[in-house]
């Protein structure tokens, strides 16, 4: 059974299709692993054992009847970040204000997983409303990194990444607002992809910052991630930001990249995303990865993106501004927590008491920053200026892609930091998103693929690969080539 849960998703899918293992057997093995280990990791907030086994049984029944499976990943179970709505499990977004809340509808992404025959094991832990870089802001307690239980797994989607690293699930879904898929992937030696904005539906993704949020696939290999990407991507009429365009062949790109041939591929190293402030072991791992890409035949050059120096400041004005608008819906009137509704308090008092009790410190901080940035007299000085910087960052990237096909950088400035180290230092926590957030501002796509263990502390390091909008296939070609050349890594457990 241990060998079964440690297998990659592509292998498991092939075994299910060949009837060498049943979907029910695999799903039960994952549920057993969760039960045996999650008291240490706290990757999950909710377990949907009955629902997952029912979905797996449906796949087995279809196979027994000789029916065609609905997707290449049918029967392979998955961990779903608790920011996507599900009718059969609570959706809390890691917040007390939504404790126990059940959505009346499934997110489009959830529906696509169900239609593909993918059993959903449960909902994973996250920073409250996806605001954080360590999963310590969850109202239900932090997730621990399987590589070192005293370290964070990254955030906001640390639960999904930890579930993969702990072999609780072969597949996972995250959401990425400023790096919440890629950064946890880097810290747990897993693969995470932020797709091009608008290619994965946001309908049913509880909004943090609507112009930045994007759901995406997570797995332990590049090919597995590509296969999941293919399942969840595509136009959705229910999402006004969804693009009506053909999705690149990411699976074909991953398979082609596995040959290890990168001749003719132009790779740019971003000047602004290395140097001072980066852990020496992270830089050493990055330089080794760049050397490996060069050895595979890629043409590597340095690229200047001057406005990246202002990306962090712009991001932490734009994101809180959108947060202050989006979270206004939690008013204690329609759904979720309600405090003081005993007939002795006004509606305004009930709303204030509910928000005071229901929102955590980081969420309150960002709401206040956003309200200030959008206030009369400060809008032009802060929010409007930040949007101008956002345009310049996108222009930097567009110009860079005139001379290169993809960009690379470290995925994070350091390896996983100790639990509690940055939780009371917002600026230090925000700086941890330095490498990943520029892509969200531009709407482009990016991947974190493991690049080994840091010689400093033996913890995982991630290589970030970036590509233009709608060029997601480039990520998978380069990522798969690098993964094949890098070879296998030790496991967390």
From Swiss-Prot:
Give Gene Ontology CC terms.
Answer: glutamyl-tRNA(Gln) amidotransferase complex
- Molecular function as annotated in GO: ATP binding; glutaminyl-tRNA synthase (glutamine-hydrolyzing) activity
**Gene Ontology biological-process annotations:** translation
The Enzyme Commission number assigned here is 6.3.5.7
Q: Which PROSITE patterns match?
A: AMIDASES
Q: Which reaction does it catalyse?
A: L-glutamyl-tRNA(Gln) + L-glutamine + ATP + H2O = L-glutaminyl-tRNA(Gln) + L-glutamate + ADP + phosphate + H(+)
Q: Name the UniProt key words of this record, in alphabetical order.
A: ATP-binding, Ligase, Nucleotide-binding, Protein biosynthesis
Q: Which Pfam families does the entry mention?
A: Amidase
Q: What residues sit in the active site? A: 81, 156, 180
Record's function text: Allows the formation of correctly charged Gln-tRNA(Gln) through the transamidation of misacylated Glu-tRNA(Gln) in organisms which lack glutaminyl-tRNA synthetase. The reaction takes place in the presence of glutamine and ATP through an activated gamma-phospho-Glu-tRNA(Gln).
The record's note on quaternary structure and interaction partners says: Heterotrimer of A, B and C subunits.
What family is reported? Belongs to the amidase family. GatA subfamily.
Q: What is this protein called?
A: Glutamyl-tRNA(Gln) amidotransferase subunit A
User: Organism, per UniProt?
Assistant: Mycobacterium marinum (strain ATCC BAA-535 / M)
What is the gene called?
gatA
